[in-house]
Amino acid sequence: MPSPLSRRSYQTGRTIYWKESLASYILFCIAAHGSLSTEVPVKSAVAPFAQQVPPTALDEVVAELTDAFIEKGTPMFMRTVLALFCGGFATFALLYCVQPMMPALSHEFAINAAQSSLILSVSTAMLAFGLLITGPISDRLGRKPVMVAALFCAALATIASGLIPGWEGILLMRALVGLSLSGLAAVAMTYLSEEIHPQHIGLAMGLYIAGNAIGGMSGRLIMGVLIDFVSWHAATLIIGALALIAATVFWKILPESRNFRASSLKPRSLMNGFVMHFRDAGLPWLFLEAFLLMGAFVTLFNYIGYRLLADPYDLSQAVVGLLSLVYLSGIYSSAKIGSLADRLGRRRVLWATIVLMLAGFVLTLFSPLWLIVPGMLIFTFGFFAAHSVASSWIGRRAVKAKGQASSLYLFSYYAGSSIAGTAGGFFWHLGGWNGIGGFIVALLIGALLVALRLAKLAPLRNLKA
């Protein structure tokens, strides 16, 4: 065994006895100081390091580790991504569980497709509005408290919506669901960008968005299958109960913020933050990208049920609900492409994912069901990949007021859902699926042009963003 190393400190006269190997001693010094100094000539293997480590070095190391980023492969990383996975699951399950029941609502309340789409659009509109408030609130109060409160409130409002018989009351509860969910949607991306090591942010964001995809799929799938056997009221209660379970898991396992620093809620400060983001060369384009991508995605899933329930397909509500399994492609693509973007760069990846969306949607314009379903799958794969890349780009691009930047991105994202989702109903009534097709293709071409514009964007100093 190697002999213990000892050396008398030049500064304090104390003797530090090192009982570890020389390698351990060197690693300790590196941890304390970040790197080896090249300014002091090294005359021996021990002397320079003994001079650099003061008696309080251990305290400094502990303080530094306390503020460190969460690294991939650590238990903290697994807890974080699992918690945000559950949060994303609950958010999208609560938000999009109403899509399969839109045809049933049209029949029960004697309303057309555009009016029925309000049950989703009112939620996403209130969510978009809430994003402008909850993001800055989290900058002051902290990330985790806002997200936990948001999930529990949204789950309870969903349960309440299943107990109300009138259309206006249902819309009111759905508005409360959207407003509540803004607390998680606005903050989750910011939490990840603050706590996860920058080298792994793409993977972490991809896993969070995978939770979104599973939530959206599960909400649609459970609702679509259940309403063939029970009332949509009962199905809504089941969705709300599952969301309560997910909210509890989220609350228990999400680590507290370690790198959060509270900032002012002064209106002038908030306005300065918004102005700063819109003056950035890239962020406004990312906000527009979110609007176009989400508008196209929600429009397809809002009205595909109307097409497949009618002639010549005449599919049952349960079978249409099962088509939500195409979300599995999004679960894979969000994590895989997010990690790929970390390696190859977001400029190279974003536009390619939109081309995939276009290719998938073109397949849905044909009549055979065996082309429609693969088209939906490819379209979904491309959408979640694009969203993963664009959303992780926000955290890298915004140098200050990251919560506000995330809020503006998601405001645009859900504004696209509300506006395009309802506007699609008019195209459906004007031209059927071909009318929907022209609308979605226009949105995707716009998204592709924005992505190509972003590909030419000059990166920030010392960042690939």
Question: What positions do the PLM features span?
Answer:
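Helix-loop-helix hairpin linking two adjacent transmembrane segments in secondary transporters
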Residues: 169, 207-252
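C-terminal membrane-cytosol helix-exit motif in multi-pass small-molecule transporters
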Residues: 241-260, 450-454
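Juxtamembrane intracellular "pre-TM" segments in multi-pass secondary transporters
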Residues: 69-74, 255-287
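Helix-breaking motifs and short loop linkers at transmembrane-helix boundaries and internal kinks
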Residues: 110, 142, 163-169, 366-367
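Conserved MFS/SLC helix-loop-helix module at the cytosolic interface between two early adjacent transmembrane helices
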Residues: 129-165
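Cytoplasmic helix-loop-helix junction between adjacent transmembrane helices
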Residues: 173-211
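C-terminal transmembrane helical hairpin of 12-TM major facilitator-type secondary transporters
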Residues: 347-390
